[in-house]
UniProtKB/Swiss-Prot annotation:
Name of the protein in question: Zinc finger protein 491
Gene3D superfamilies associated with the record: Classic Zinc Finger (3.30.160.60)
Zinc finger boundaries on the chain: C2H2-type: 35-59, 103-125, 131-153, 159-181, 187-209, 215-237, 243-265, 271-293, 299-321, 327-349, 355-377, 383-405, 411-433
Keywords: DNA-binding, Metal-binding, Nucleus, Repeat, Transcription, Transcription regulation, Zinc, Zinc-finger
Keyword rRNA-binding: no
Organism placement in taxonomy: Eukaryota, Metazoa, Chordata, Craniata, Vertebrata
Pfam name, any one: zf-C2H2
Gene field: ZNF491
PANTHER family, sorted: TRANSCRIPTIONAL REPRESSOR PROTEIN YY, ZINC FINGER PROTEIN 143
The protein's role, per its UniProt record: May be involved in transcriptional regulation.
Subcellular location per the Swiss-Prot or TrEMBL entry: Nucleus
Similarity comment text for this entry: Belongs to the krueppel C2H2-type zinc-finger protein family.
Entry's Gene Ontology molecular function annotations: DNA-binding transcription factor activity, RNA polymerase II-specific; RNA polymerase II transcription regulatory region sequence-specific DNA binding; zinc ion binding
Annotated GO CC locations: nucleus
GO BP: any one term: regulation of transcription by RNA polymerase II
Length: 437
């Protein structure tokens, strides 16, 4: 029987004694009829149960919350079996093992294992802190965050990947990057089993199951499931474009778009396919390409069951069921499937051609045309038909070509119902009806 370390005072409701104050009482500073707590070991007096319990553990060496991860694994390094005397410390300690990060920043997609961590980080958004950046004037709460923030201005990248030599400003960034080499995807969805290498991607995916959209625009009421989409949408109201290319003078509203744009100048393609060696500017293009090897089609239409490899194709397809009208150009009225294609089309009116070939100087108004042109210099034909082996420089060409083998004819004449493998063939045919009229 353990020593009774704490006893309720006379006149209390139950008079029960405890070896430790119960957890449900810890959040109460005092209770009616309960006196201050005196330690039998050292004689120190405490007004609260929590302080009393902590002191008892210090005196007796009692550590009730033991981490099973340390007990289960025979660690070869200097890591010891950890025992923590406070239950909330134990829960916080366990999170690196479970990868649980329950505290989300409402401003961005970063998540944290403890309230203290997120409070410290939130100051980077509010700008209320004692450490002021000499470059931009931003104030930070913590010296380590201040030093880390300064690297965004100085360009210092002290953390290097041992596999490929790529350098990063933050230690956490190099750890995440290393997963591209190891293939580690530690965050697994309990609903569908899909795995992710980033906690932010995992949480965003979870919301596709729950339908949760916690980020709501104050201007128009539109809601979003991730902060990046929400902030991007906000800029459609403000017109803000905070990311400017110093080489070309082009301003962009999204950091990811800015980074992708800069790779056009540097030629950097950090995302490399392990199967065929092809490299990509953006992670989304890389993931789409990976599916060409695996055959994965994660986007499935609930109406007809048709599946797609990328979200944009899926969204375009959904409009065939909803009857949603595509967006139109303000200059000429031409209709397009998305705002992205309106922007690209708009360059035909402005004459803007932001993508220039380093080999011959030829410029292009859209990135896909630029990449296609680059392949004419390299002689590269990365898209090969699985049926006959014929190779193509562009993904759209192989999709059209494969319809010869599959017999798919997705473009149908509204007048007579005749179907075609290409939209241009369908439009040409439809004109025969107007001529006959």
């Amino acid at each position: 029987m353990g020593e009774r370390l704490f006893e309720s005072a006379e006149g209390s409701q139950c008079g029960e004694t405890f070896t430790q104050v119960p957890e449900d009482m810890l959040n109460k500073k005092t209770l009616p009829g309960v006196k201050s707590c005196e330690s039998g070991t050292c004689g120190e007096i405490f007004m609260g149960y929590s302080s009393f319990n902590r002191n008892i553990r210090t005196d007796t060496g009692h550590q009730p919350h033991k981490c099973q991860k340390f007990l289960e694994k025979p660690y070869k390094h200097k890591q010891r079996r950890k025992a923590l005397s406070h239950s909330h410390c134990f829960r916080t300690h366990e999170r690196p093992h479970t990868r649980e990060k329950p505290f989300d920043c409402k401003e961005c997609e970063k998540s944290f294992i403890s309230p203290a961590s997120i409070r410290r980080y939130m100051v980077t958004h509010s700008g209320d802190g004692p450490y002021k950046c000499k470059f931009c004037g931003k104030a930070l709460d913590c010296l380590s965050l201040y030093l880390t923030h300064e690297r965004t201005h100085t360009g210092e990248k002290r953390y290097e990947c041992k596999q490929c030599g790529k350098a990063f400003s933050w230690h956490s960034s190099v750890r995440i990057h290393e997963r591209t080499h190891t293939g580690e995807k530690p965050y697994e969805c309990k609903e569908c089993g899909k795995s992710f290498n980033f906690s932010s991607s995992f949480r965003r995916h979870e919301r596709t199951h729950t339908g949760e959209k916690p980020y709501k625009c104050k201007e128009c009421g539109k809601a979003f499931n991730c902060p990046s989409s929400f902030h991007r949408h906000e800029r459609t109201h403000t017109g803000e474009k905070p990311y400017e290319c110093k080489l070309y003078g082009k301003a962009l509203s999204r950091l990811i778009s800015f980074r992708r744009h800069m790779r056009m100048h540097t030629g950097e393609r950090p995302h490399k396919c392990k199967i065929c060696g092809k490299a990509f500017y953006s992670p989304s293009s890389f993931q789409r390409h990976e599916r060409s090897h695996t055959g994965e089609k994660p986007y499935k239409c609930k109406q007809c069951g048709k599946a797609f490899t990328c979200s944009t194709s899926f969204q375009y397809h959904e409009r065939t069921h909803t009857g949603e009208k595509p967006d139109g150009c303000k200059q000429c009225g031409k209709a397009f499937r998305s705002a992205k294609y309106i922007r690209i089309h708009g360059r035909t009116h402005t004459g803007e051609k932001p993508y220039e070939c380093k080999q011959c100087g030829k410029a292009f108004h859209c990135v896909s045309s630029f990449h296609r042109h680059e392949r004419t210099h390299a002689g590269e034909k990365p898209y090969e038909c699985k049926h006959c082996g014929k190779a193509f420089t562009c993904s759209i060409y192989i999709r059209i070509h494969e319809r010869i083998h599959t017999g798919e004819k997705p473009y149908q004449c509204k007048e007579c119902g005749k179907a075609f493998i290409r939209s241009s063939y369908c439009r040409k045919h439809e004109r025969t009806h107007t001529i006959n009229i």
